[in-house]
Amino acid sequence: MATKATSSRTTGRPGVKKRIRKIFGDIHEVVQMPNLIEVQRESYEQFLRSDPATGYVSGLEKTLRSVFPIQDFAGTASLDIKEKDGYVLESPKYDVNECRQRGITYAAPMKVTLKLATFEVDAETETKSLIDIKEQDVYMGDIPLMTENGTFFINGTERVIVSQMHRSPGVLFDHDRGKTHSSGKYLFAARVIPYRGSWLDFEFDAKDIVNVRIDRKRKLPVTALLHALGLGDEDILHHFYDTVTWARAEGGWKVPFVLEQWRGSKPAFDIVDAKSGEVIFPAGQKISPRAANKAAKDGLEALLIPTEEIFGRYAARDLIDESTGRIWIEAGDEVSPENLDLLDKAGIDNLDLLDIDHISTGPWIRNTLKADKAPDRDHALADIYRVMRPGEPPTRETAEALFDGLFFDGDRYDLSAVGRVKLNMRLGLDCPDTVTTLRTDDILAVVKELVNLKDGKGEVDDIDNLGNRRVRSVGELLENQYRVGLLRMERAVKERMSSVDVSTVMPNDLINAKPAVAAVREFFGSSQLSQFMDQTNPLSEVTHKRRVSALGPGGLTRERAGFEVRDVHPTHYGRICPIETPEGPNIGLINSLSTFARVNKYGFIETPYRKVVDGKVTKDVIYLSAMEEQKHTVAQASAELTADGSFVEELVSARQNGEFVMAPRDTVTLMDVSPKQLVSVAASLIPFLENDDANRALMGSNMQRQAVPLIKADAPFVGTGMEETVARDSGAAISALRSGVVDQVDATRIVIRASGDIEPGQSGVDIYRLQKFERSNQSTCINQRPLVKVGDLIEKGDIIADGPSTEFGELALGRNVLVAFMPWNGYNYEDSILISERIVKEDVFTSIHIEEFEVMARDTKLGPEDITRDIPNVGEEALRNLDEAGIVYIGAEVHPGDILVGKITPKGESPMTPEEKLLRAIFGEKASDVRDTSLRLPPGVAGTIVDVRVFNRHGIEIDDRTRAIQNEEIERLAKDREDERAILNRATFNRLKDMLLGQVAAAAPKGIKKGVEIDEQVLADVERHEWWKFAVADDARQQQLEAVKAQYDTAVKAIQEKFEDRKEKLERGDELAPGVLKMVKVFVAVKRKLQPGDKMAGRHGNKGIISRILPQEDMPFLEDGTPVDFVLNPLGVPSRMNVGQIFETHLGWAARGLGKRIGEALDAWREANPNPEAGQPPEAVRELLKEIYGDNYAAEIDARNDEQIIDFAQSVRLGVPMGSPVFDGAVEKDVTDMLRLAGLDESGQVTLFDGRTGDAFDRKVTVGMKYVLKLHHLVDDKIHARSIGPYSLVTQQPLGGKAQFGGQRFGEMEVWALQAYGAAYTLQEMLTVKSDDVVGRTKVYEAIVKGDDTFEAGIPESFNVLVKEMRSLGLNVELSSLDDTDDDDGLAEAAE
């Protein structure tokens, strides 16, 4: 089987640790996969930046220019944007990291250059003359910026704007599928959807009248709309119908012979040739196409038709007696014997009739015209006005203004370029896409197409076709929101212009940018599409950015979305993943883009195809949207090709109009580029996806996004080859921006000296800061580790550091573990998992979670709160972890209830108890006037303090702890500065030395004579910084020296300025919320080991809960004594139909066996060559690697030297990494070949032994290496207990849920259970003292304190609430208590 190489760059240069993954796959991809987060970045780039070179205008500029110029109501002033460079985005005040730490928005201030022009208007001639123009830069608020990874920092949290899928603007034709009318006939409808503005609906009703609705209001006959457009009755009829002239002749009427009309018909009368009088077609006989063609060929031109046949036809024109003005017949009137007599008398021999035959052309528009009550344009406009503004009396002017504003005014109605393109395509129009309002021709064309559908011509549209749905990405969503804000601002500006003297003000005085800023803030802060980024692991980040949602403003709602919208559609192929979508109410509404998909400029999703020319597949790749693909026949990526690109088979499996067909090879026009273009990123990470049931694959792709990053990441032995792409594009692993040499490496940063020519003004140093133990949005741990050593050569794009869940630049969500499929004492019943103690002991699945806690000291009415170590009534033991400032130390081990930050709050004076008085007498004031409001660690959290950040309000004196943190940060910045300077000096002075050597000194520093030839000794005698004082005789060289000096000075200055700027920001104080004096954030790292109750999963939708952790010695073990790690239930496979996991297990078993073989060969070589330098080369190891990896990797393995081969062999001794790409992966034969090569049984099964008895199990068991993930559903986060806690305000019942520290609900069914057992007292205490009997609760507490265990139940608070609710309904219900007497009189009295 031919295999393709992973990457041509894996040549083992020093420094780049990179695996070679053995990929099973025949298909070589001709096009590179687009960057996975390109959708986000490109969209926002188009919103922010115009490109004068190509003439592209950014979305932001388009929006600004659509609102400006703003004119006042009188027309005496106009506020406009400067024509060129109208706006500028300045550099942001804080960088991304500062925004994350300070909790602020990463944004750039926008300045717009506005011109205020004032005019004088001549009252008589109404001409304007310009008086004055004032220009000024106006601040228009901050525009949030996107980070390199496609996210936004809003108030310090990382957010993603999800793209929205909505109905494309344009025209859609549809019918009701016979559901509206009882007869079941189809009622056709057309809808013109604009980008913004009024919707226009045309529809047939049950009487076959064509109606129109504007904005889903009351319906009107369509002819009212056509009249309003200025068309008369005759114009309307002529537009929809042809005209036939009937001429009076002897014995009837003479009509032109139209071949198509008569072919295949059965006339009810004899058809006579008007010229010869012969009967050509007798009555009652079907006219065959052959006979009709013969008649036409014989020269038949006109037919003679009996007079009765004219009755029931419709006149095409008004016929008027010109002398008297009497109308004989109106256009559209039916011809009857009466009006035919009138025409006879008038001597009219020729009649123009509408060509309506009731078969291929129906009288729908004519009938509508007759049903229309409005005779002319004015009446039609008035009718439309009454529908749109019911209750207001129309005048001609208001009606005309309203109608023009509805569809023909660019400010109120916008089809957008997309809408115009769709309209043109559907209706066959030819109108430039700059015309974004409706035209009369458009409306006529829509009605004509609708009538054609009714007449049985053409097809209705499919709403769910991706040609009729488009994607709105970040840029467009923000553009729409910003326009809303600007329009609000425009109103305010107009009012301000009319209320002040415009000649005395500047643009700044008129503009209040608050509405625009508020619109942007609202969009990023609270829009349904602006979401808190899912940052569990790198895959979840990438998937979140590639998500496409049909929900959100202007989209669908969960409740209204039917089955069709959610379903997979043939046009999804290669555009939207058919697998990855949530389970539950959002299924099918939230989707993921496929791997190769991209969004075009119109917002349609495109997918790439290879062109097929003359039956040969070329390397040309074109991207097509669903509309463009319709006319093509597309072959599968797996179709077999010859060397020259021709198809091997005569019939090729292909797609045509959404159907799968076997097409002849010469009809194929396109071919897929890759088998994985069908699925999304997450689904493409599942090996053997083709062997899994789709429902399970859906769960698998969703659960990979919940995998928690572990302390040690393991790339899968069995992957798909996509792992590296995801790690790189997600930004989790750091790739080098420029090539160079590694200068310094430590845990927190990598310094690379750039090689090659450095552009002037650019630093020659790249410093990469690594994120160390930072908290993600989901509290998982973000930690990056360097992969390079000092002196390594780095190429641009190389992975230099691993991030969370990555290993050597590959995505690594879980661990490879040894699993056995067998039952074990019921501990794997119903998907439970039995695991070995080794997994816990060796921290295989241990993860670190970082929790953030914050406390604020505010200014209260009673005085300021204080963060301090001096807390009343707290012993020294509780304060052991706090420093002098009252803040916990970094590195302290903390447990639930421990104080993290000491805080005291002033409290009002209240009457003192004797105890308080005593305390006050002993300790003075402090004890009474403050209360302890310290930040304590909540239950269920225990760990180590990893970071503390203190924020102080500007102008407040800072404490020692804050100063220490600041100094530490400044030292770090200074270290960066010194490193950059040192590398800059080294590089510059080496270059300077090369330029000076051999030159003659025209000027020199002190102590060196002029005219001396500069050599090594001369330079050694002078301090380095004095070298600049040399001048050389060679003018060209002297100019070069001066250029280097200028570049050096600029670089030194830039480094210093950067340092000063950051230092100043640190010392400036922080922007805190109003009323907050000080804020402290404490980060606690929690180590979560695997324990029973944690959820684990594979990549095939196979999930389970850990039921028991078994000692290693009790686990089933292999023949060599190795105990297995996991025991899974084999019954979890057959009914779930996810057989991919078995293939993975077998191939993983082979990978482990091959790794063992390599390890043995390596150990044998080491034994034979104790001194590697003097010994034999490791040829046996090299040959074994070549045998395992196959011919495609031979060149790559040969290119490595002996040392690299040993390193390589060492790195794969635990298991050889393999890749099985989706739909093109390893087949059964490949798996058995690998098992054979590893020296293992081809069945993949082995004899296992019981760890407790040492006996072999009865039959062989499937054992292998499987990739297992630990999911973000940890038992520690879910387990919860409460004795007492908060109560609901009204009902006084305990709250619910862990977050509220609530209780367990004792519901209706639980009450029934206790009633059934007759446990009356238990039930009573459940419903009273343990719930909402307030008095009883207190009494029970007091009794328990005194050691008494009796209690009395009182009245539950919810009863009182019920009584109050009944009273609010006007029912005076009172609860009367009686003394314990048995006489009925008492009851009677009470009742009275």
Swiss-Prot record:
Gene3D superfamilies: 2.40.50.100, 2.40.50.150, 3.90.1100.10, DNA-directed RNA polymerase, beta subunit, external 1 domain, DNA-directed RNA polymerase, subunit 2, domain 6, RNA polymerase alpha subunit dimerisation domain, RNA polymerase Rpb2, domain 2. It holds the Pfam family RNA_pol_Rpb2_7. It catalyses: RNA(n) + a ribonucleoside 5'-triphosphate = RNA(n+1) + diphosphate. Keywords: DNA-directed RNA polymerase, Nucleotidyltransferase, Transcription, Transferase. It is an enzyme of class 2 (transferase). GO terms for cellular component: DNA-directed RNA polymerase complex. InterPro entries: DNA-dir_RNA_pol_bsu_ext_1_sf, DNA-dir_RNA_pol_bsu_external_1, DNA-dir_RNA_pol_su2, DNA-dir_RNAP_su2_dom, DNA-dir_RNAP_su2_hyb_sf, RNA_pol_bsu_bac, RNA_pol_bsu_CS, RNA_pol_bsu_protrusion. Its EC number is 2.7.7.6. Belongs to the RNA polymerase beta chain family. DNA-dependent RNA polymerase catalyzes the transcription of DNA into RNA using the four ribonucleoside triphosphates as substrates. This is DNA-directed RNA polymerase subunit beta. It comes from Novosphingobium aromaticivorans (strain ATCC 700278 / DSM 12444 / CCUG 56034 / CIP 105152 / NBRC 16084 / F199). The gene is rpoB.
